[in-house]
From Swiss-Prot:
Entry GO MF terms: initiator methionyl aminopeptidase activity; metal ion binding; metalloaminopeptidase activity
Chemical reaction(s) catalysed: Release of N-terminal amino acids, preferentially methionine, from peptides and arylamides
Organism of provenance: Borreliella burgdorferi (strain ATCC 35210 / DSM 4680 / CIP 102532 / B31) (Borrelia burgdorferi)
Keywords carried by this UniProt record: Aminopeptidase, Hydrolase, Metal-binding, Protease
Name the UniProt record assigns to this protein: Methionine aminopeptidase
Length: 251
């Protein structure tokens, strides 16, 4: 992982342009999430949209990954490889994507419902998404990384969901993955560095319906909940500007 590098306001504007295009890409994918569509078809939609807008997909070819998006269905947490699998009513699918625009990287994820889902799954998505914003609110000068982590954990814990521990948020902007790591639970063994002006982070809670443990499928990429419970994942690229958090991956 590339070391921490703070960004100037001009550089943050360029990351914002990348992240805004990324947000539009996810909207384009979302419009096509219906029962019967395959995750590969969604991948091609994202690829075409990014290329049409004179940018590059950040994931495609990264450490050998074949997709433009990670499409993780139901019990799959992250890094799902797009393929022939067709979405069905009652599924959920996490779409994680990255964009490189003019050399600047952004990273974003949302979990979408396919048709009608069980109320417990609705609650999982609602809580995971809300926890992201609780974490973002703590990304301000004067705080430390674990203030973000604790806010996410404190919000999720009363609901009894399992917070994934093996994977974290991270710095982003000049590269796809930069320092620091941003865990989604209070983990004192992580580097608890100070939040600084010009810091850009990808904050991304990953939360399972039941237990927190995860495993990796035989494809070497797809991470899934070990107890096969459904999993949600939400992520934004966020910068510290004038001491406060500014979400870059919103339109």
């Amino acid at each position: 992982m590339t070391k921490l590098r703070l960004k100037s306001k001009d550089e943050i504007k360029k990351i914002k342009a990348s992240a805004s295009l990324l947000a539009l890409t996810l909207l384009e994918v979302e419009r096509n999430i219906v029962p019967g569509i395959s995750t590969k078809e969604l991948d091609l939609i994202a690829y075409d949209f990014i290329i049409k807008n004179r940018a590059k997909p950040a994931f495609k070819g990264y450490r050998g990954f074949k997709g433009t998006i990670c499409a993780s269905v139901n019990e799959e947490v992250i890094h799902g490889i797009p393929g022939k699998r067709k979405l069905a009513d009652g599924d959920i699918v996490s779409i994680d994507c990255g964009v490189i625009l003019d050399g600047f990287y952004s990273d974003m994820a949302k979990t979408f419902k396919v048709g009608n889902v069980d109320s417990s799954i609705d609650k999982l998505l609602e809580v995971t998404n809300a926890s992201l914003y609780k974490g973002i609110a703590e990304m301000k000068v004067g705080n430390r990384i674990l203030n973000i982590s604790k806010a996410i954990e404190d919000y999720i814990k009363p609901f009894g969901f399992g917070i994934v521990r093996e994977y974290t948020g991270h710095g982003v902007g000049f590269e796809l993955h930069e320092e620091p790591s941003v865990p989604n639970y209070y983990a004192p063994f992580f580097k608890n560095i100070r939040i600084q002006e010009g810091m850009v982070l990808a904050i991304e809670p990953m939360v399972n319906l039941r237990g927190h443990k995860v495993s990796i499928k035989s494809d070497g990429w797809t991470v899934f909940a070990s107890d096969l419970s459904y999993s949600a994942h939400f992520e934004h690229t966020v910068a510290v500007v004038d001491g406060l958090p500014l979400i870059l991956s919103e339109v």
